[in-house]
Amino acid sequence: VTLNIVIGIPTVGRAPILRETLRALARQSRRADRIIVCGTKPSDVVGAADIHGAEVLLSSPGLPAQRNALIAAAPQADIMVFFDDDFLPDPDYLAAIERHMAGDPTIVVATGLVLKDGIGGPGLAVNEAEAVLRTARPSPLGVLPTFSGYGCNMAVRLTTMRQHGLRFDERLPLYGWQEDVDLSRRLAAYGEVVKIDAACGVHLGVKQGRNSGVRLGYSQVANPLYLAGKGAGYPLMRALEHIGRNMAMNIIHAARPEPYVDRRGRLRGNLLALADLIRRRMVPERVLEL
């Protein structure tokens, strides 16, 4: 079985790193049928259309809206592989996705093995990521059930999404925050969500182009509670654990924050969301007013 596999890359404010990522995609042993990039304004995608036939489109702002625009632009695709604009996949990433998702039609979401993730630190340089990829020896057989896909690298079966009318939830504005988990849990009602070790890569975790700490902090509280309240497979206990873990990190580091994380802004956002919760006016969209 040959699948039609399209890569979709949502991007904002990081055109130089996007171009590096597109160049890296030329090394895939199984070429994508199409590569589509979605920005929110022309400056997001400068130079992208010149690289390996990448197609470029613009959508309204917000990661879920961009993801939905990418899906809408690929009506013929069986699978869409979402990469962040700063994720460098192993050359056999798409081949591994096709092997497993063609071989097992019950897989509706597949996420890869992140060999190194710069999101928890200052971020990684492209040459560091390439060094990690050169020495990686992922297991060709490792496929395990997992709770959700990780948005920086996740493959979704679009045929299943279309059949059941599923989309990313655009009530989660800006950076999305948990939009990947929400969609994974809704798709889990119709099949398997797995992690495929052979589909590996490195997430640079570039800090440029990310949102304000206050807004992100608000979303860290508001989004999980909103998703749990939908009753669509996102458990309340998971939401509470997620909020507790993030708030604890923000409190611990607020006095001496890492230079690359706005901990005080995030903590302020956490507290604003809790205050709104008490007043019964907490909704994900409120971040747009902050």
Give the label of every model feature segment.
Residues R23-A32:
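Short, acidic, metal-binding catalytic loop of nucleotide-sugar glycosyltransferases
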Residues P64-I79:
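Active-site nucleotide-sugar/metal-binding loop of Leloir-type enzymes
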Residues A77-L88:
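Short beta-strand-to-loop acidic/aromatic patch adjacent to the donor-nucleotide binding site
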Residues D92-A125:
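Conserved donor NDP-sugar-binding/catalytic core segment of glycosyltransferases
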Residues E128-F147:
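Short, flexible, basic/aromatic active-site loop/helix in glycosyltransferases
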Residues G149, N153-V156, T160-G165, E170-A199:
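A short, conserved alpha-helix in the catalytic core of glycosyltransferases
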Residues Y175, E192-G213, P224-L227:
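Active-site donor/metal-binding and catalytic loop motifs
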Residues V214-N223, G233-L290:
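Non-catalytic, C-terminal membrane-associated alpha-helical segments of glycosyltransferases
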